[in-house]
Amino acid sequence: MEIGLREWLILIGIIVIAGILFDGWRRMRGGKGKLKFRLDRSYSNLPDEEGGSAEVLGPSRVLDTHKEPELDESDLPSLSASARDREREPKPVKASKRGKRVSAAADVQQGDLNLSAEQREPDLFADSDDDFAADNNRSSGAAPASSSVKELPPAEEVLVISVISRDEGGFKGPALLQNILESGLRFGEMDIFHRHESMAGHGEVLFSMANAVKPGVFDLDDIDHFSTRAVSFFLGLPGPRHPKQAFDVMVAAARKLAHELNGELKDDQRSVLTAQTIEHYRQRIVEFERRALTQKR
């Protein structure tokens, strides 16, 4: 049997294909389990930076999550808290006693608004700070004595900030009450509002707020129909243990009232309250503390 050219070509092709397949199978078998990669030696010689290798190769770590500060709800003023405070307030027993408190609180006011039909310019400010000091003496005698209330010496200086309404209708009772409750003031002695150390109405009195219109007090029983053209914030010296901090709180409360209820800030000289006036008040506090320290020596 003779093998022709055609048969030889077919046989050679089969042998070549078999060789290729065998070589490929051998390479695949020999390369199993080996990780083929090229190492860039320019990076392998670099020193570790800030523990970077530990961050990559080390075990996983649990990082502390950042917690936002939480606000204690007990520090926030609320209408419910003010309602409970009003329920605990002792009601006047006799009309004569209430009359005394009204007359005493009327003197603490910053001035008198004349709202008669003549529409004259209202006098909102007292002529001197001595009136406030004298009023403190009279109010302490008119108010009922309480063992829990600390007797304070007569005020030698009084820092006054008034807020006058720009609206002809004045400050409406419900809006005014909501605003000052948010600032931490609570209804108390002499039928006016006081800001204590605690927003809940506990601790020493930092400053007070009176009605600038006679009789100078607030009637919570008729607050829905109440309105006033102006109110006065006042801080007596000597008074709180930290008068500068108390004054800053008073300024913040007055500004909040003026901003939210469309009011205008005035000082005790019937002038617009400016940053210079506030700084002058602070200097008066520093000077008073210096004099008090000198007297103790």
UniProtKB/Swiss-Prot annotation:
Residues 136-149 have a biased composition (Polar residues). It holds the Pfam family ZipA_C. Keywords: Cell cycle, Cell division, Cell inner membrane, Cell membrane, Membrane, Transmembrane, Transmembrane helix. Residues 83-92 have a biased composition (Basic and acidic residues). One of its GO terms (biological process) is division septum assembly. SMART domains: ZipA_C. The keyword Membrane applies. It comes from the Bacteria. Belongs to the ZipA family. NCBIfam families: septum_zipA (TIGR02205). Essential cell division protein that stabilizes the FtsZ protofilaments by cross-linking them and that serves as a cytoplasmic membrane anchor for the Z ring. Also required for the recruitment to the septal ring of downstream cell division proteins. This is Cell division protein ZipA. It comes from Pseudomonas putida (strain ATCC 700007 / DSM 6899 / JCM 31910 / BCRC 17059 / LMG 24140 / F1). The lineage of its organism: Bacteria, Pseudomonadati, Pseudomonadota, Gammaproteobacteria, Pseudomonadales.
